[in-house]
């Protein structure tokens, strides 16, 4: 069966617009009643990598979280908490002052800090046979992932699948980078983790995404989209296509399909665009050509659902080509380098040679110390060993290549 990915075009963090589009998008996934039982304990898991200004696109935008929280409350869901195993700091520390804390207070959703890690067996895992997961996560009956559209130095992109790494408790995240140092082993572990925790569905904030040196130090870039799906691999594959990256070049997509988490191939993904009514006539015949405001598609053929979803909102089943033509960004700064699969690259991979690693450019370094303070490794893998008047130095024997 095809996986359905919902695309919500939205050019600003406007709560009312996001709320309306998201609510109608959820109806395309069968509605919340078919996804979540009213009595279930719900855990919302945004991307809270570290404390940062929301404009820097490091964390899931508070307005996206707030709009979804509003929908949950209006639909009668009562038992809801929000948490993440943050890269730096606690959940409460990271959200303080971002506006997310204000939304959570408004909708009476507590932000909780994980207090205890529990070792759980994962006998069916391909890469990871056990995890250390937070007690509070294990107590939840329904997990909803609210990721951020970003690049990632190791996995090329971080989205729905990678967001689940925030399920791992505390310092065990740093240990995981050491235990699974290659892009492939880390990706397989992430697939195992998603299959173990089984988030009910996934939302990706891509209104302002991050390109370049992600996931923590890249540049904000407007993509003007929110993506939703019950299939994280399909969701990340659409993200990849939107930035002109072949989905199978993303290790979590490649292994995600191979290991049965979801669909990576285009023919197995149905894309539905839920958008504001582009004209006075919201409902068109199926198979008609879109013109006028949507001329950017250059008369691309789309299949249009005859049912109008909500006031001034329409639902279009659209081809991947038409989606990319209208909403894609070929200039998005992401690693599109092809990985050569010959005897030398296999040998280098086996011996951990030519691994990607962080590097400080002495001419550009301002000696701010952020890299030193952010390093999660006990004893620090980067420090001012040559004095604070000189750039910090990495100890690659200690470095876990977290790229945070």
Label every PLM stretch briefly.
Residues 1-279, 295, 299-362, 366, ...:
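N-terminal and secondary-structure boundary signal
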Residues 281-287, 291:
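Ser/Thr/Pro/Gly-rich low-complexity, intrinsically disordered segments
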Residues 289-290, 308, 399:
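Generic short N-terminal amphipathic or hydrophobic helices
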Residues 396-404:
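Short Fe-S-cluster ligation motifs
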């Amino acid at each position: 069966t095809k996986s359905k990915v919902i695309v919500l075009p939205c050019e600003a963090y406007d709560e009312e617009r996001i709320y309306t589009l998201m609510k109608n998008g959820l109806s395309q996934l069968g509605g919340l009643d078919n996804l979540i039982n009213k009595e279930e304990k719900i855990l919302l898991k945004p991307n809270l990598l570290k404390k940062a200004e929301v404009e820097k696109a490091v964390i899931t935008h508070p307005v996206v979280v707030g709009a979804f929280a509003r929908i949950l409350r209006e639909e009668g869901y009562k038992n809801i908490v929000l948490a993440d195993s943050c890269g730096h700091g606690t959940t409460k520390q990271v959200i303080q002052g971002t506006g997310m804390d204000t939304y959570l207070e408004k909708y009476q959703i507590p932000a909780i800090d994980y207090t205890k890690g529990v070792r759980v067996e994962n006998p069916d895992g391909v890469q990871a046979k056990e995890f250390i997961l937070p007690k509070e996560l294990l107590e939840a009956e329904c997990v909803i992932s609210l990721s951020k559209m970003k690049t990632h130095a190791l996995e090329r992109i971080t989205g729905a699948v990678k967001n689940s790494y925030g399920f791992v408790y505390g310092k065990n995240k740093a240990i995981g980078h050491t235990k699974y140092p290659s892009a492939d082993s880390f990706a397989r572990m992430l697939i195992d983790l998603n299959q173990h925790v089984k988030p009910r569905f996934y939302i990706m904030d891509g209104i302002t995404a991050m390109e370049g040196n992600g996931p923590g130090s890249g540049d904000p870039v407007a993509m003007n989209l929110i993506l939703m799906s019950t299939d994280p691999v399909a969701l990340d594959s659409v993200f990849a296509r939107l930035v002109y990256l072949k989905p199978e070049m993303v290790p979590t997509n490649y292994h995600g399909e191979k290991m049965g988490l979801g669909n990576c191939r285009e023919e197995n993904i149905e894309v539905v665009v839920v958008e504001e009514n582009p004209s006075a006539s919201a409902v068109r015949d199926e198979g008609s050509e879109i013109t006028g405001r949507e001329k950017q598609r250059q008369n691309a053929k789309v299949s249009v659902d005859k049912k109008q979803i909500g006031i001034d909102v329409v639902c279009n089943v659209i081809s991947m080509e038409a989606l990319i033509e209208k909403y894609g960004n070929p200039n998005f700064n992401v690693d599109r380098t092809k990985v050569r699969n010959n005897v030398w690259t296999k040998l280098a991979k086996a011996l951990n040679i030519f691994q990607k690693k962080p590097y400080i450019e002495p001419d550009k370094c301002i000696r701010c110390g952020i890299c030193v303070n952010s390093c999660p490794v006990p004893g620090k893998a980067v420090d001012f060993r040559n004095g604070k008047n000189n750039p910090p130095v990495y100890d690659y024997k200690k470095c876990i290549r977290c790229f945070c």
